[in-house]
Amino acid sequence: MEALRQKVKEDGVVIGEKILKVDGFLNHQIDAQLMYDIGETFYEQFKDQKVTKILTVEASGIAPAIMVAYKFGVPCLFAKKAKPNTLNKGFYQTDIHSFTKDKTNSVIISEEFLDEHDRVLIIDDFLANGDASLGLNRLVHQAGAETVGVGIVVEKSFQQGRTRLEEAGLKVSSLCEVASLSGNKVTLVGEE
């Protein structure tokens, strides 16, 4: 996705050698047209998978996930980082470590919204070490459902996330792959 690659190059802010801040279009302020285009792209990549549900984790994955769900015509479900008082039925739960925030959250999904009949496409904003997607995949398995793929908006390919997801048997598609953040500069795969 050339528009996304351009945004990452022009608007991404490098913080150290492992963190890329994309608040201007994805993680704080959202570029709606770009999210729509992301939805279309993931739809084209996974349209033959008979997807019944899109799954992400709150909060930054929600914007692209909603657009993907819109294109598929299926619900978008997000794992919550806290159990609300309104959740009085059963739920699936797992721990997910956030690379960016260096914090582990216990995330939950109501049993009401995910079951063994679902074919789930996981969507996330970033792929670093793969903890978020692996955690979401654990929730899918708890429900007896099937993960048909993982769609990543921005992958930091210099980290181990893709390898870990593929070792878990997951099909991974990334729209923008960052090769390096060295020298306070974003270098995309293919530019090295």
UniProtKB/Swiss-Prot annotation:
Protein name, as recorded: Xanthine phosphoribosyltransferase
Segments crossing the lipid bilayer: none
Amino acids binding xanthine: L20, N27, K156
UniProt gene name: xpt
GO cellular-component term (any): cytoplasm
Signal sequence residues: none
Record-stated family: Belongs to the purine/pyrimidine phosphoribosyltransferase family. Xpt subfamily.
Alphabetized GO MF terms: xanthine phosphoribosyltransferase activity
Record keywords, A-Z: Cytoplasm, Glycosyltransferase, Purine salvage, Transferase
CDD domains noted in UniProt: PRTases_typeI
Assembly and oligomerization: Homodimer.
Record's subcellular location: Cytoplasm
EC number(s) stated in the UniProt entry for this protein: 2.4.2.22
